[in-house]
Every structure is written in C-alpha cells, then in structure tokens.
Regions:
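Glycine-enriched, solvent-exposed interface loops adjoining structured elements
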Residues: 1-226
Length: 226
C-alpha cells in the first residue's frame, strides 16, 4: 500500500524537482491536500465511531475530538443488551427550549451541534450513559514518522491515492508557480474525485431492493409511480 515515503518519491519524480527546498515543502503540500480531500469527499471511509460516557456533568457539552468535521449519528443504550435508541438532531435553540433546566433528568432524546468541538444532549440522562457518536472525521495526518496524531499511511493513501496525489501536485505546482501545468493537475484531481464520489454512491445504493418500513410489518412506504 502507498505510504508517505512512496508519495514523497512520486511527487519528486513527477515534478522532476529534487531540490532540498522542494522536499522541505512536501509535508505542507500533503497537509493541504488532505484537508481538501476531507471537504470534497462524502465517503464511509471517513466515518469513525466513538463511545463517550455522558452524565449530568458533561451532557451540555459532550466533547468531540479535533478531527471531527460532521456528526452523522448519535445513539445510546440504557444498559447492555437493550435496544439502540437513535437521538434526533435539532438546533441548540430547540434543545435549550425543550430542556431549559439542565439539572432536571430524563431519557436522552435530542442532540445538537453546540460548537466545532462539542454537542449538547437533552434531556440530561438520569445516570452515566454510554453514547456512540458516528462522525465524518479527518484521518490521522500522513507524515514521515508515526505518533499520536500522525501515521505513515492512512485512508487517503491506501484507498484514494490518485486524488491525494493530484491534490498534492496542485499544491506543489502552486509553490513552483507553474501556472500552465496547474490546470492539468486540477483537471486530473476533479476526475479522481468524481470517481470516488461515484464509488461512494454505489455503496449507498439499494440494488433495486423493494422499499420497506424499517419498523417491519406491512410495507407502508410507496414509491412514485407504483
């Protein structure tokens, strides 16, 4: 699988620029490219699941890690083995109106994005409750050495290499002020992104399965023209 070293060599060979100054800039090219990919892709490969203990002490501001970009889903179980309950997403204003007294407790029903680094859950749970948060997150940063926040390979390098490579070339070409070639890499990047978006759509298609109610029983869902 392609890793940081592979990508670095590929960039140097493609640009035919083996200068020390260029090599020093490569980590910055990669960082900017990864940020671009996270914004341009809607891919299940970016999804992460995190379990967080929620209680009266933090229900008003449940922390999210700094790589979270989108909160997709929040659910919980009252105790082990019980049915999973999905919380409904609402605005902060709605949550505050619905449950104005945070000291009061009840069964969690709603969540809202409070800031870029936290969500609010209401009602405040009666006791500590484990909540599973599904998020679209920035993968750990690709770098030459491993650590708590970096890795030599990640989802982009392993499954989206062409898009990552062309995105890096856009940054490299901007750095070298090669305006004519810049349009070539931008075009190649868009082609790679469209391919990945099509792949993402294919993961969500139902392959012509008959629409049915998730609750089971008689089918209450009808399709247009049926």
């Amino acid at each position: 699988m392609p890793d940081y070293a592979f990508l670095k060599t590929d960039l140097i060979n493609t640009t035919e620029n083996d200068s020390t100054e260029f090599a020093t800039q490569i980590p910055f090219f990669i960082t900017k490219a990864e940020f671009r990919l996270t914004k341009d892709l809607d891919d299940v490969g970016l999804d992460e699941y995190t379990n967080v203990s929620v209680s009266s002490g933090n229900a008003g501001a449940v922390p999210l890690n700094d790589r979270v970009r989108i909160v997709r889903n929040v659910n919980f179980k009252v105790s082990t083995g019980t049915t999973v309950t999905n919380l409904l997403q609402r605005t902060v204003e709605y949550a505050n109106d619905y449950w104005p007294v945070s000291a009061s407790t009840g069964t969690p029903r709603y969540y809202s994005r409070r800031t870029n680094s936290s969500i609010k859950i209401v009602p405040t749970p009666v006791s500590a409750t484990t909540v599973e948060i599904q998020t679209a997150s920035q993968p750990l940063a690709l770098a030459s050495a491993t650590g708590t926040s970096v890795t030599t390979s990640n989802y982009f390098s392993e499954y989206c290499y062409n898009a990552l490579f062309y995105s890096c070339l856009i940054e490299a070409t901007l750095y070298m002020k090669d305006w004519e070639t810049l349009q070539v890499w931008r075009s190649e990047y868009q082609n790679a992104i469209q391919t990945l978006r099509n792949q993402a759509r294919r993961t969500r298609q139902d392959d012509m399965e008959v629409a049915a109610s998730p609750a089971g029983g008689p089918n209450t869902i009808t399709q247009a023209g049926s």
